[in-house]
Amino acid sequence: LGVIRHMCDRVGVLYAGALVEQGTTADILSNPQHPYTVGLLRCIPRGGLHKNTDRLETIPGSPPSLGLHFDGCVFASRCSLADDRCRTEKPEMVTVGPSHVARCFHHDKAPSMARNIEGASQGLSNPNKRPAPAGDLLNINNLSKIFAQDGNKVQVVNDVSLFVKPGETLGLVGESGSGKTTIAKMILGLTSAETTSVMTLSGKKLARALNKRSVEDVGALQIVFQNPDQALNRRHSVTRIVSRAVERLSGFNRTESDNRAHELLSGMRVDASLHNARPAQLSGGLKQRVAISRAFAGSPNLVVCDEPTSALDVSVQATILNLLVDLQKQDDTSYLFISHDLGVVRYISDRIAVLYLGRVMELGNAETVFNGPHHPYTEALVSSVPAIDGSQRVRIRLEGDVPSPANPPTGCVLNPRCPRMAGSGVEGLCTTVEPELKEVEPGHFMRCHIPFDQLRTTQA
């Protein structure tokens, strides 16, 4: 929606195949007049909201199946303003402003309609909950990965060291090709890390390859993929998809596993009437709930969330994020959360690691990383996020493309694109010596030769 704000002149809002509102971009995003549009905009995790203090708003209910016949308004079943007229009579488009129309009998009440903030989910019963360690849950040291490409060695992850505490969310951000997913795959054992890499879970060393790990370790580390269509077996029912994971990770028999699967699905608010459905019969949001249910089949300590909401609309995204937060609070589950959506990462993360060309460039508490002073690369990332309210921030542009890891720049890997190097007084260092990741203030780390106080001054 932020991109739409900056790229489009006019916007049309569709629901259940019907155009429910249309107008200039400024009118639609700043003065919405249809309850559905109002609800969509309220679902967005805007700056300043955080899981520890704020629950995301959602739109109640679920979208109807396409092709259904409606006697009245297509949104009536989910609308807090709906009355008998809305359910029996189809509203026409009415003019609500210059070049602004809405299909609603109560458009004048829409901007001030009651907010919908659902209570916490009922949660998941967890008979096999693992005790949380006293220290770090996950600790990775000198994590590296080298691939062979055309006879050459290409290092795509370079000596990354991170930790995740029990009940904490560590966000991973960075441009495509920065190494986020490769790091996640190495943690999960799907890709073998280099022999110099050391990973421990609850103080116990993790084997680098998945087939060398115990069932206990596999159950303790799970993943929610970006695309549930590819992650769920379309030949199995929803219940069987989850129960197979329960059987493998918990040792239950078929009946016990099916019962546990029903508990997990119900805890994720998948209605019992859908437990025997196939994935193709479910919406994208419901598929992702099934995928999350499966990830929790083995009572994991840490779940890798690899772009888990990128394929979902903002209303479904808000519901999924709320459910993830509920599960985390219930069992102290930790998340490694990968996303290009910085608003989502800021909302759900406790700490954030910013990656570039396989290296951690900045690491710190979520608000510290977003509020600055920033590493120059983080500064550029944050400035590139289009604001939905139309406000204009100074855009810090990175020149050129991300260099190939097969031929990384000498010195700091960001130096050919760095927006702060020129005039910094340390250009010689930047182009010849790779900086170390150093603590610039308590709990805040940067990989940069430019003095921290100088960054603070130039970014003020």
PLM feature spans:
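A short, proline-enriched helix->beta-strand linker immediately N-terminal to the Walker B motif
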Residues: 297-301
